[in-house]
Each structure stands twice: as C-alpha cells, then as structure tokens.
Amino acid sequence: ELIGLVGNNGAGKTTLLRLILDLIQADDGFVESNGQKVNESGTWKEYTGSYIDGRFLIDFLTPEEYFDFIADVYHIDDETLQERLAQFEGFMHDEIMGTKKYLRDFSQGNRQKIGIIGAMIINPKVLLLDEPFNYLDPSSQMTIAHMIQRICKEQGTTVIISSHNLNFVADISSRILLLEKGKLVKDLPNADGAAIAELNEYFGIQAE
C-alpha cells in the first residue's frame, strides 16, 4: 500500500512519522509494526527504511562512505550494494558518486537524493519519507514519484509519504490520510486519483 499523509503546517504529519520510527514517545498509546511495539523491540528497524530530514545524514562522509555504512548496518554485501545503487544512476545525474565531496558540501537537492536513496537501497518492507519532493527540480520530482510507485508495486513495500504537494500525492497514493491538529479527519481511498477533488475542496475552504 502507498499511503499519503497530507495536512496544513502543524497538522502532525512529521510527528506521526517520528512516532512510527520511535524517535519521539507518544503521550498516550503506542505504535505497533508487524505486531510488535516499536518502543519495546528493535526488530522493525531491520525492514524499515526512512528519510525524514538532513539530520539522518552523516555529514563528514562521502556518498560512497555513507552508502557503505548503511550496507554494513543492514548486512548488504558490496556486489548487491553496487547493483542496487546502479538502479539510481539516472536519479543521481553524475552529480553525487565520484565527486569526493562530503555530504555537508552538497546542495539541498542532492542531499535529499542521497537520503532517499539510502532509505531505498535496503529494499525495505516499510518505507517512510517526509516531504520527499522538497528541494528537487521537476524532473527529479517525477523520477522520485515513479521510484516510490515502483518499490511499492514490485517489492510489495508499504510506503508512507508526507507532502504538501497534493498533485503528486494524489497521483501515486492508493490511500490518503488527512490530518488536522494531530487528528485524523479523513481516510480517503484514492483509486485513479479519486481523492483529489475532496482534497482540493478541503484546502480551498481552509484558505478562505
């Protein structure tokens, strides 16, 4: 399933993702992944890929070192790593690998790409991305949208993305969750982009 999280600033989209990743603790209740509470077991980390923001990167590493680090953590051999990275060559546009630059020295857009690739190369069963279209040029936005769809369809990955870009979310999501002030106010099926009219109406009313 490919789930889109939408809502105005402060609606709770990023907070929800951080709760799922056990980066913050809930005041009440708990989060389960595959039947296990994320704050009591770390097994969910083995099959979960995520990129929330630049703090997930290790700024003093080169891209090669960063991807090697991820591969070591997830026990991915070098041959497999190189095969998976090759799938992203077009997305990187020869601007990332082989540059001998540290992550801190890349543009926001290329840092975004590195973080997203790092989340995807583990072939996760669950993938969480916060504002994946931020900082990217239009062609890269289209590419990442197709990549997200592909990993969901071909690998059976459950994907949750948050975004202010309603059109992209409506284009690729099978289900859209609308949050408002920390609460779920709509759970919209989105076959063939059916939810976009209701979303446009909601946000149009909010803007008046």
Regions found by a protein language model. Give the residues of each.
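H-loop/switch region of ABC-family ATPase nucleotide-binding domains
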Residues: 162-164
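Helix-to-loop junction immediately C-terminal to a conserved catalytic motif
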Residues: 21
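A short, proline-enriched helix->beta-strand linker immediately N-terminal to the Walker B motif
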Residues: 121-125
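Conserved ABC transporter NBD signature motif
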Residues: 29-44, 186
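The feature captures the beta-strand-to-loop junction immediately N-terminal to the Walker
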Residues: 6-8
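Hydrophobic anchor residue at the start of the ABC signature
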Residues: 116
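Catalytic Walker B motif of ABC-type/P-loop ATPase nucleotide-binding domains
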Residues: 127-131
